[in-house]
């Protein structure tokens, strides 16, 4: 059968041009004339509805669709704007929403257009492009009143005002082109009326006869008769058949009115096979024609030939593929449509022609050479032409003609696809000069040479599409049947994702025990396996047939960009190819095995949670890293057979597998879904939270991660059920520690030295990876690879560590620091391990050096996706051993108690030559004591000690001793645990950290600390203290507890590891058996906590005894008056900035002097405690004016026992009687300070510093009680008011004068009527302690400020706080610089007031501020003016004759109070010194303020 060449080609061209109009329904031609319109019934597009049509135009502008609510708010318009569709609509007068298509529609091609309304949303679909837009309206529904208009608006609507809701629509030009197949909600609307619109000419009856297809070309109807068996203008003429071979002339060749179409439906497993062996083909020119209709993207349509002589016609990714090889190389052609794909479920016609042509060649000889030109056209429009190579021009085939598929499509030579066709094929015809094979017809008629495989329906039926599925989570997967591809096979599929990692396909075979050369080595399991995985966006093929693994990167570009990719894997024996979007990559498997034995099921998208029985080869990294695939998969074919994975997923009820595929915009992280500072990244339609640095777990980092506390003896050990072999690991954890050393995590093996270990090493994180090459008979290993990152990580803060290994590549990340990277140098990349251990390495058999145990906290350990700490703690795994403490616990490791100051232990020499990291914890109540000492060569040594409650670190590297004082707010002997870290780096940067406070200093010179001999801990032998370096203050050892001792990464046991032990050193730390309580001491006595009990400081109570409840030493002063005088030795007269006085008494006198303290003759400083008009009053003068403080709210001359407490600091004072509120006195500012400030402005600049220093010294002197000489008790002196009554328990600045009088102290004399009552009380320690009784001076509390104190009251509900004003000596103040070498060392005579605990719920002391100007004072000043002048002259005379030696302060007597200085040595800021404005008798002395 052949066409008339005059009409045939023309009709085919035209017929194919309009083939898509078949079954499109009525069509309309819009001429584009002025006033053109077409009116249809109202489309109620309020809620959910759809409208669709096909269009063809070449105009760049025009109105397509319009309707509205007739002038109110709502409208919708669809225009052509610049060749693209523009959709614009509004609801409820909202701002109109607009969307533009990307597809150009003015290309004179047919385009399918759909409008979908869904309340506020409207979707525009142009061919395969989908765009949607939402209007920001307060109402959901669209109101429609008008008709549906196409192509234009009637003139009457344009002329009437307010009839059109969209004012701009009347200016739009009419549409010019074709519209067909109009549907509204699935049905064809009725045309109400039109103007300027032509109906389809082809609708008239009998335009084309015998089933010819009518179309309009140049406004004329044209008939396509190609499928009718007729020809002519109206398909009425009979087609002439040319006779051929008898065996091909089948069926009726005569006339017929209607020609039957031969078609068949293929569903993926069916195919036709025509046997050519009886009559092989041998041709130089031939033609193949067929029509197809499908929704599938890939599939074989026709194939004939084998080896290097074949023709292959297939659908490949929606395009038509032709491959021809005549023996000298393949000619390949790929025809793709301009828009969309050919798998659009519409009929498409394919024609392939091959003709022999003669071409002139230029060369040695002018020879005409023959070439074969090949032309392929689809739908008569898309044509590709090429030439086969010159040497071979004949197609010869004695094989088979395959139609719709084959038994093994992947094995066909030149086949670009591996799966069979799914859809409809009709009129498949091959013909050459000699033969015409109507293959579709032969199959239906059952020709004996034609074999039909499968159940084929010889009509076109709908073929179920292979719907895509989406794997929504890494845990989702589908199980497929076992893939039997022992010798050869193929798998193809499409996928799309934006995620970088995931296991797409995996299957393995039966385990094969491997024989090891070393009989001691365990047997390992070897399996055949097949996998396709994604890592870092790249696609990999992995294959092992038993003789070695091949790993092939399918394509060099990354394939996680969200686009569809077609993957086709084909294998034949040891070789094969994997292609991605036609980019083919070959591979060759190593070894000799050609059989792939896969015994297990094939897993798609991931692996099951229960993996018992599964064996993961080390080469499949995604399986071991637990990277499941997240994304879409479609069109899966195995050996050419389709797999409906949607139905399979539904049948398996696969969790997390959705039967569709849509790509959402990457906006998942915009709402900040990751809580607790988790890091968010966009995944495939999901967000992915990185919680590794947060301390939380869960999809959104919403769940607290378990914290484990390690004290050096605790661990967590994961004992895996089977030995693991990996080539890739992901490890992350958080830790917090104060030690510079300790193992964080390690993998260990029972059979080798393999390990991946994370540990702290000198404050840095160290990663060690050791792959034991020796046992596995590979290239000898060069030793473990080591990488460091971070510094000073032992700061007791949380730090995050991440490790990523991929084969030989290592990456270590700490917090947000720059990653440290490394490479494994050996050939071996496999890590073997049985255990994952934390805290302690218990599998030590093959370790040359065991890392130090960990002390600190771990959280969030994740190893290859497994959160082992929480899995173990929650009981989700039963192969873990855990004894670490759960939760955040305060860690005290291996505590040891030094029971006495003479106890100590010795350890081997401290190794600190280049650098040093020491850590320990201590708890004590002792203010002083030697903690560590190690001597060295020459002058080298190191000492750590407590001095008055503060830590001192002393060292000498050969350049002289250097002292660093630790920084702490309060003394450290408070019976609480304190953490101490001392380090020295290679640059001589010394660091001392106490709890959270850090002190650093760099020393110059020598950098090496060369120690030798034993390391003493807790003290040294008694006879060694005198030989300690000068900067070492300790004279006794440390009494208290030490714990968590870390000596440069070594954790010694202070008992079992000790070389020697002296005194009582016991394990554990119980602390004091008796502790201070609120009521431990009576009468406001201060409780002093000591290691073996407590004692009471009764100084300011007037009482005595162990608990301050015994009467103090009491004297009765008779009616004739008595006097007790204490006189300081001439060289021991103190000068004080602060004073403390307490005494108890009973009397009935209204006026009397109780106590008076005087300075040396001529100075005039004094302090006097007296009763005036029945009230207690104190008057003192320290170089300014007399300052008074008085308690007027209570009379004390009632014969009852009263206690008076007085303190002074400079010019400030406090007074308390009994339990009354404390009265505070703050004098007003000194007027002379203002005068001096004015004078300072006139002092030359060069003398400014000198004057300032002098003024500062004068200011200090104005607050000092100078050169105290006597303490007089009883007031029996000439002109005074003697006291009559009882005085008890007198205390003044550490002196208990009444006790001293009773004991006959030579510095005390008793005169007149003063008689001792009762026995002298004593102040001793509680029964649990062993402190001796007090002597003449207060010896019970020489360092009260270094001890935790509790003040007790003998009355409920009344608690008074003793003022913090302290004793100071002007010429011997405590240094305030931390770098000072000699600390302040007050003598036993200076008693400091101890710090008190916070008073809660008690009233604040009453503060009384006296006025500096009263009427009485003014009158007194006026009356005494003349007397003041005489006194002033006398004072000046005394000054000129005064010896400077009278201002000498004996520095050997130090009355400085520790509590008067800040913990770092700075003096407490004093309150301003005030002097009344109207001064009384001024003392014009040089120590005052005259310049």
Swiss-Prot record:
Question: What InterPro entries does the entry give?
Answer: ConA-like_dom_sf, EGF-like_dom, Laminin_G, Neurexin-like, Neurexin-related_CASP
Q: Which UniProt keywords apply?
A: Calcium, Cell adhesion, Disulfide bond, EGF-like domain, Membrane, Metal-binding, Repeat, Signal, Transmembrane, Transmembrane helix
SUPFAM superfamilies xrefs: Concanavalin A-like lectins/glucanases
Compartment(s) where it occurs, according to its Swiss-Prot or TrEMBL record: Membrane
Record-annotated Laminin G-like domain positions: 28-208, 263-460, 467-661, 707-880, 894-1069, 1113-1314
**Annotated signal peptide:** 1-27
- Which molecular function GO terms apply here? metal ion binding
Biased-composition ranges, Low complexity, are 1322-1353
Composition bias of kind Polar residues appears in: 1354-1364
Identify the stretch(es) annotated as Disordered: 1318-1408, 1457-1491
Domain of life, per UniProt, equals Eukaryota
GO terms of biological process kind: cell adhesion; sprouting angiogenesis
Q: What's any one GO cellular component for it?
A: membrane
| UniProt-listed SMART domains | 4.1m (SM00294), EGF (SM00181), LamG (SM00282)
Q: Where is the EGF-like domain?
A: 198-236, 665-702, 1072-1109
In the bilayer, the protein is annotated as: Single-pass type I membrane protein
Stretches in topological domain Cytoplasmic: 1437-1491
According to the UniProt topology, which residue ranges lie Extracellular?
28-1415
Give the protein family.
Belongs to the neurexin family.
Function recorded in the entry: Neuronal cell surface protein that may be involved in cell recognition and cell adhesion.
Extract the PANTHER family matched here.
PIKACHURIN-LIKE PROTEIN, SP2353, ISOFORM A
Could you identify this protein by its name? Answer: Neurexin-1a
Lineage here is: Eukaryota, Metazoa, Chordata, Craniata, Vertebrata
